[in-house]
């Protein structure tokens, strides 16, 4: 950040009075610019024990597999955002959303909130964001081509809970980027 969104003056990275973290502060008007984590919302859509996954058609990680998820928009509820992202990435409608997993991705300042849900019908198709969309069994999950660590964790938690026959709300965290193999 270089300039104040209130007055247009240059900002300085400094610790404001009565604070403990460096923030962008405008010396001209005194505005403190807080930068907070971004919320990513998504779904684990299921139809007859199969999970709907999509192959990314956009960067980052084009060509890798993921669950439908994306950034929450202003003025949108968390569940509505998860539904919208699922529709945008798969062309499908989901029902019976239940909050399932929250993952803090500390190093990139993101928080993921994933819902368990059902497909309203087995209707889905590729979209601008997904080059391929398909239902997969546990054995068909492309583990060697998962786009993001958070998606891998989500799938592992989900499959573990499904196998145990019991779901509860979970939390997890990712502190650092994956290391190259």
Describe these PLM feature segments.
Residues 1-42:
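Acidic, metal-coordinating catalytic segment for phosphate/diphosphate chemistry
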Residues 3, 23, 44, 53, ...:
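Conserved hydrophobic/aromatic beta-strand scaffold that supports enzyme active sites
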Residues 5, 12, 27, 52, ...:
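Nucleotide phosphate-binding site architecture
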Residues 21, 36-40, 46, 60-62, ...:
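Short connector loops at helix/strand junctions that flank enzyme active sites
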Residues 28, 56, 69, 117, ...:
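Active-site donor-binding loop signature of nucleotide-sugar glycosyltransferases
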Residues 72-157, 161, 166-167, 179-181:
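Unchanged
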Residues 171-177:
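Short, highly charged C-terminal tails/helix-capping segments
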């Amino acid at each position: 950040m270089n300039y104040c969104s209130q007055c247009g003056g240059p900002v300085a990275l400094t610790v404001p009075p009565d604070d403990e973290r460096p923030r962008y502060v405008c010396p001209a008007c005194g505005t403190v610019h807080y930068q907070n984590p971004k919320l990513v919302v998504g779904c684990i859509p299921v139809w007859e024990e199969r999970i709907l996954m999509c192959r990314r058609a956009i960067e980052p990680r084009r060509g890798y597999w993921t669950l439908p998820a994306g950034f929450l928009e202003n003025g949108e509820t968390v569940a509505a955002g998860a539904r919208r992202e699922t529709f945008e990435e798969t062309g499908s409608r989901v029902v019976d959303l239940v909050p399932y997993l929250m993952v803090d991705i500390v190093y990139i300042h993101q928080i993921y909130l994933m819902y368990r849900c059902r497909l309203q019908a087995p209707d889905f198709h590729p979209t601008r964001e997904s080059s391929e969309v398909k239902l997969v069994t546990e054995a068909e999950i492309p583990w060697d081509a998962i786009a993001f660590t958070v998606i891998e964790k989500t799938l592992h938690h989900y499959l573990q809970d499904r196998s145990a026959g019991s779901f509860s709300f979970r939390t997890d965290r990712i502190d650092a980027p994956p290391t190259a193999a």
